[in-house]
From Swiss-Prot:
Residues 152-167, 232-240, 305-331, 379-423 are cytoplasmic. This is Growth hormone-releasing hormone receptor. Residues 1-22 form the signal peptide. One of its GO terms (molecular function) is G protein-coupled peptide receptor activity. Coiled coil: none annotated. One of its GO terms (cellular component) is plasma membrane.
Length: 423
């Protein structure tokens, strides 16, 4: 097998691997580097054409062979990419004969081996992950649509807390739609070269994906901020705070995404805008996300501290099993609502831990919207009570007063009022 066929086999497998974690698969770096090496090699060959006797500078599909005199042997190492598959660096030799360059020795498959079956298995693995996250986002979108419809249709559930839940639900739906749009743009054909693919639809899908991701993180943060203010506030009025959260939750992601799009158009308008690992402009998107996850985690710990204090008996410390259960239940409910699981990978490089990161962030993460809809709508006692009242036609006048008004307990020792019911 000559170098051209060997390079074509590798390109065919690598360029068809799916996009992972919102970025082109790392092997695309190898293909991009090869294309840059080819361009440099051919430009140098054009400048040196007919400048000397012997063998001219030549690109064979993987390596650039320099000019050489008759009878001269040239040795070059395998491209750096092949070191991932072999502990010993390979090398090739070519002889400059009177009739031109000889064939590389040893042949490329022997000098620079690549387990093609491994790449095939990797492609199959990514396809499976894609099926899982497509299913997850689809299920989540349907559940979230139903949850929003319930919160909007039942007027007794109209309150700032549920308004914020609805905004968060909407961001999960937007995120699912962005994933479907991106997949449609990138994977509409099996023959598409994902490493160099570049269309307006592709760039729009990537920008939409970034905006959806940022809005999702911003409303996860809004949930944490709102609950913190609710637990610590001395005033039951929260509607003004809600509108500030709306402005920040949608406005800031739009501002950062618009800035990123402007920078890409002006300074880095290449490929499909998803080669971001080495781009300084990527931090316009990633920086606010990392910051929001860090702040969210801090607020999560603070809320657990507040809950621990409020569950503490007057005489002593928390020690009874029911109180431990209440605290554990509250903590577990906050994890999907605040997206605390993102702390695990959010501070690592995008290419780190792909083997674990893909199933967790793409697989389980796609079901996060479904879990949030279940916990904060379908299993919510107020929602179930209101649906039951509507279903059985109960007279609203017979409902207890706490169903329609906010009730505030007396100040605790810490002088913070405890909200027992919001709606």
């Amino acid at each position: 097998m000559d170098s051209g066929v060997w390079a074509a086999c590798i390109f065919c497998l690598l360029s068809s691997l799916p996009v992972a974690l919102g970025h082109v698969h790392p092997e695309c770096d190898f293909i991009t580097q090869l294309r840059e090496d080819e361009r440099t090699c051919l430009q140098a060959a054009d400048r040196m054409a007919n400048s000397s006797s012997g063998c001219p500078r030549t690109w064979d599909g993987l390596l650039c062979w320099p000019t050489a005199g008759p009878g001269e042997w040239v040795t070059l190492p395998c491209p750096a990419f092949f070191s991932h598959f072999s502990s010993e660096p390979g090398a090739l030799k070519r002889d400059c004969t009177t009739t031109g360059w000889s064939e590389p020795f040893p042949p490329y498959p022997e000098a620079c081996p690549v387990p093609l079956e491994l790449l095939t298995d990797e492609k199959s693995y990514f396809s499976t992950v894609r099926i899982v996250y497509t299913t997850g986002h689809s299920v989540s979108a349907v559940a979230l649509f139903v949850a929003i419809a319930i919160l909007v249709a039942l007027r007794r559930l109209h309150c700032p807390r549920n308004y914020i839940h609805s905004q968060l639900f909407a961001t999960f739906i937007l995120k699912a739609g962005a994933v479907f749009l991106k997949d449609a743009a990138l994977f509409h054909s099996e023959n598409t070269d994902h490493c160099s693919f570049s269309t307006v639809l592709c760039k729009v899908s990537v920008a939409t994906s970034h905006f959806a991701t940022m809005t999702n993180f911003s409303w996860l943060l809004a949930e944490a901020v709102y609950l913190t203010c609710l637990l610590a506030s001395t005033s039951p009025s929260t509607r003004r705070a809600f509108w500030w959260l709306v402005l920040a939750g949608w406005g800031l992601p739009l501002l950062f995404t618009g800035t990123w799009v402007g920078c890409k158009l002006a300074f880095e308008d290449v490929a499909c805008w998803d080669l971001d690992d080495s781009s300084p402009y990527w931090w316009i998107i990633k920086g606010p996300i990392v910051l929001s996850v860090g702040v969210n985690f801090g607020l999560f710990l603070n809320i657990i501290r507040i809950l621990l204090r409020k569950l503490e008996p007057a005489q002593g410390s928390l020690h009874t099993q029911p109180q431990y259960w209440r605290l554990s239940k509250s903590t577990l409910l906050l994890i999907p609502l605040f997206g605390i699981h993102y702390v695990i990978f959010n501070f690592l490089p995008d290419s780190a831990g792909l083997g674990i990161r893909l199933p967790l962030e793409l697989g389980l993460g796609s079901f996060q919207g479904f879990i949030v809809a279940i916990l904060y709508c379908f299993l919510n006692q107020e929602v179930r009570t209101e649906i039951s009242r509507r279903w059985h036609g109960h007279d609203p006048e017979l409902l207890p007063a706490w169903r329609t008004h906010a009730k505030w307990a007396k100040p605790s020792r810490s002088r913070a009022k405890v909200l027992t019911t919001v709606c």
